[in-house]
Regions:
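Glycine-rich, N-terminal phosphate-binding loop and its surrounding beta-alpha-beta segment
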Residues: 105-156
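Aromatic (often tryptophan-rich) hydrophobic motifs at membrane interfaces
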Residues: 130-131, 281-400
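Short, high-confidence coil segments that cap the C-terminus of an alpha-helix
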Residues: 75-77, 138-141, 295, 351-354
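Active-site/acyl-donor-binding loops of N-acyltransferases
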Residues: 2-38, 151, 155-221, 355-401
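A generic structural signal for short coil/turn motifs at secondary-structure boundaries
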Residues: 117-121, 268-271, 331-334, 365-368
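A conserved beta-strand-loop-helix scaffold within acyl/acetyltransferase catalytic domains
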Residues: 40-86, 90-104, 151-153, 194-334
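A structural signal for short, well-ordered beta-strand segments and their strand-loop junctions
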Residues: 142-149, 249-251, 301, 356-358
Length: 401
C-alpha cells in the first residue's frame, strides 16, 4: 500500500492550458507505424504471450489483453495474429466468441481491437480485414464485430464546454472538430461501401464500446504543464483537497469492498445500474497488483485520516493509463477527494512514462441540465480532449443459421 498527498506544492493558478496541438494529442493516443508491413496478410492463432507483446509494441486497449480474456470465462477466447508475406507477426487481436444456444454458430467480437498498424490498414483495409472475416467464417461465426480504434476526430475541451453552456450538446456531428483524420475517413468510406453496419453509435448506454472518449495528453508534458491545462475550478479543488488533508493510496483486491460501496452509492445518486462486486474483484485479480507493470491494475483510494471518500479502478496497458470506474460518498464533499484522486493518478501515469490518461466514454447527447452533463464537464475540466474513433462495426457472415 502506498500513501501520498495529492499535491505538496501546487503551483499558483495560471491561465491557459499550455497543451500541444490537437494532432499531437491524437499521437498521444495512437501511434503510427512505419514502414508498412508487406501483404498479403494471413491470420492464425497465436499464444497469449505473443498477443500481449504485440499489443504493447503497437499500442492497444485493455479490452484486447490476455488479462481481459481472464475476466470472460463464459466466452471462448482466441489470441489471433496477423502475419505479413515475410512471415512476420505484424498485428494481433483478442477474439471473444460465444455460441448460440442449440446452434453450431457463434458471435465473434474484438472489443476496441485488434492492435494493428492502423495507418497502413486505412490505405488498404481489405488486405487486413478480409483475412479476419475468412477466419471467422471458418470458425463458424454467424456475425463478427470489430471495434475500429483509429482516431477519427478530436475536439478541445473549451469547444465542447462552450456548446453545452449555450444550450446543450445534441450531436457531435454538428460541432466543428479541432482535427479530422483523412485516414479515418478513408477507412469509414470503405466500411460504408461494404456490409459493415455501425453498432452503438450515439450515447454510451447503447450496446457496444464508446465511440467518443475523453483523453488527457501526457506526451512530453510535466505534471506542472498538465496542471496548467486544467480549468481554474479543478486547480482550486486540488488545493482544497491538499488543505483538507486528503491523501491518496493504491490498494489491490483488498480494496474492492470499499470501492464497491462507494460505487454503489454513486449509482443510486446518479441513477445508473451498478455492476456486481465480483466483476471488479475478478478484474483486479486478472490484471495483477499495482500499476507499475506494463499490464496491471490498482484501486485508488482518497481518504482523510483513513475515512475513504472516493475510490477508482485504474488500469495501465503500456503507454495508456485508464480510469475505468469510480465512486464517491456524499460525506465531506468539500474535501474534493475525487479531484485529489484523479490528480494523483495522472501524476503516477506521468512518472510511469505513459503518454495518455484515458477517462473513457460519456453520453454524447447532453443538454445543459442533463444529469450526465456533470460527469462530462468533470472530465473536460481536467484538460481532456474529446476523441472520436471509427468505432464498432458488425458484419453478418451467415444468415442461414
Amino acid at each position: 500500500m502506498t500513501t501520498r498527498h495529492p499535491s505538496e506544492h501546487v503551483p499558483d493558478l495560471i491561465e491557459g492550458r499550455g497543451a500541444p496541438a490537437a494532432l499531437d494529442r491524437v499521437a498521444a493516443m495512437q501511434q503510427t507505424q512505419a514502414p508498412a508491413p508487406n501483404g498479403p496478410f494471413t491470420v492464425r492463432p497465436i499464444s497469449m504471450d505473443q498477443l500481449e507483446q504485440t499489443l504493447l509494441a503497437l499500442g492497444g486497449s485493455f479490452l484486447q489483453t490476455p488479462a481481459w480474456a481472464q475476466t470472460k470465462p463464459d466466452w471462448r477466447r482466441t489470441a489471433l495474429g496477423w502475419f505479413s508475406s515475410d512471415g512476420d507477426l505484424v498485428g494481433a487481436g483478442l477474439v471473444l466468441s460465444r455460441n448460440l444456444p442449440r446452434l453450431k454458430r457463434s458471435f465473434a467480437y474484438l472489443p476496441e481491437g485488434p492492435s494493428l498498424a492502423w495507418a497502413s490498414v486505412a490505405e488498404d483495409p481489405g488486405a487486413w480485414i478480409d483475412p479476419l472475416v475468412a477466419w471467422a467464417k471458418g470458425e463458424g461465426a454467424f456475425a463478427l464485430r470489430l471495434g475500429f480504434p483509429l482516431v477519427s476526430r478530436t475536439w478541445e475541451p473549451e469547444i465542447v464546454k462552450k456548446q453545452i453552456s449555450e444550450g446543450g450538446l445534441m450531436s457531435f456531428t454538428s460541432l466543428d472538430p479541432t482535427s479530422d483524420s483523412p485516414a479515418a475517413r478513408s477507412l469509414e468510406a470503405w466500411l460504408d461501401r461494404g456490409p459493415w453496419r455501425p453498432i452503438g453509435w450515439g450515447n454510451t448506454a447503447a450496446v457496444g464500446q464508446p465511440r467518443y472518449v475523453c483523453v488527457v495528453n501526457l506526451r512530453d508534458r510535466s505534471a506542472d504543464e498538465v496542471l496548467k491545462g486544467m480549468n481554474q475550478q479543478w486547480r482550486r479543488n486540488i488545493k482544497k483537497a491538499a488543505k483538507a488533508g486528503v491523501q491518496v493510496r493504491t490498494v489491490g483486491v483488498e480494496g474492492v469492498d470499499t470501492f464497491h460501496d462507494l460505487y454503489a452509492e454513486t449509482a443510486v445518486r446518479d441513477h445508473f445500474f451498478p455492476r456486481a462486486k465480483s466483476y471488479f474483484a475478478q478484474m483486479v485479480s486478472a490484471f495483477g497488483p499495482g500499476t507499475e507493470g506494463r499490464v496491471s491494475a490498482a484501486i485508488y483510494e482518497a481518504h482523510v485520516d483513513g475515512d475513504v471518500l472516493a475510490s477508482a479502478l485504474m488500469v495501465r496497458v503500456g503507454d495508456m493509463f485508464s480510469y475505468l470506474y469510480g465512486g464517491a460518498t456524499s460525506r465531506n464533499r468539500d474535501a474534493r477527494a475525487s479531484n485529489a484522486l484523479q490528480w494523483q493518478a495522472i501524476q503516477d501515469a506521468i512518472e510511469l512514462g505513459c503518454s495518455a490518461y484515458d477517462l473513457r466514454g460519456f453520453n454524447t447527447s447532453l443538454g445543459a441540465t442533463s444529469p450526465l452533463t456533470g460527469l462530462l464537464l468533470f472530465k473536460l475540466g481536467v484538460g481532456a480532449d474529446v476523441i472520436e474513433v471509427v468505432g464498432e462495426r458488425e458484419i453478418v457472415l451467415n444468415t442461414f443459421w
